[in-house]
Amino acid sequence: MSHSVKVYDTCIGCTQCVRACPCDVLEMVAWDGCKAGQIASAPRTEDCIGCKRCETACPTDFLSVRVYLGGETTRSMGLAY
């Protein structure tokens, strides 16, 4: 089972999701489109175990973890930006 983390425009740059992830999937990256100047990105989605701790930790419901199977996974990986 593979997972992809979708990102939206409500990130406040608090880093709660990064700290909550037990697999070090997330990291903060510079992003001019938000107040904080940084957002959570998921460059290591292959390490995601789907525990959704990042979702639970997020105060703005910024992250959405979805499970994708087979070929759909590779098409969906581009959503982690």
UniProtKB/Swiss-Prot annotation:
SUPFAM superfamilies: 4Fe-4S ferredoxins (SSF54862). PANTHER family: PHOTOSYSTEM I IRON-SULFUR CENTER, PHOTOSYSTEM I IRON-SULFUR CENTER-RELATED. The keyword Ubl conjugation does not apply. [4Fe-4S] cluster 1 binds at residues 11, 14, 17, 58. GO terms for cellular component: chloroplast thylakoid membrane; photosystem I. PROSITE patterns: 4FE4S_FER_1 (PS00198), 4FE4S_FER_2 (PS51379). InterPro entries: 4Fe4S_Fe-S-bd, 4Fe4S_Fe_S_CS, PSI_iron-sulfur_center, PSI_PsaC. Apoprotein for the two 4Fe-4S centers FA and FB of photosystem I (PSI); essential for photochemical activity. FB is the terminal electron acceptor of PSI, donating electrons to ferredoxin. The C-terminus interacts with PsaA/B/D and helps assemble the protein into the PSI complex. Required for binding of PsaD and PsaE to PSI. PSI is a plastocyanin/cytochrome c6-ferredoxin oxidoreductase, converting photonic excitation into a charge separation, which transfers an electron from the donor P700 chlorophyll pair to the spectroscopically characterized acceptors A0, A1, FX, FA and FB in turn. It is a peripheral membrane protein. It is an enzyme of class 1 (oxidoreductase). Binds 2 [4Fe-4S] clusters. Cluster 2 is most probably the spectroscopically characterized electron acceptor FA and cluster 1 is most probably FB. Residues 2-31, 39-68 form the 4Fe-4S ferredoxin-type domain. The eukaryotic PSI reaction center is composed of at least 11 subunits. [4Fe-4S] cluster 2 binds at residues 21, 48, 51, 54. HAMAP family: PSI_PsaC. Keywords: 4Fe-4S, Chloroplast, Electron transport, Iron, Iron-sulfur, Membrane, Metal-binding, Oxidoreductase, Photosynthesis, Photosystem I, Plastid, Repeat, Thylakoid, Transport. Pfam families: Fer4_7. Its cofactor is [4Fe-4S] cluster. It comes from the Eukaryota. Its main location: plastid. It is found in: Plastid, Chloroplast thylakoid membrane. This is Photosystem I iron-sulfur center. One of its GO terms (molecular function) is 4 iron, 4 sulfur cluster binding. It comes from Guillardia theta. One of its GO terms (biological process) is photosynthetic electron transport in photosystem I.
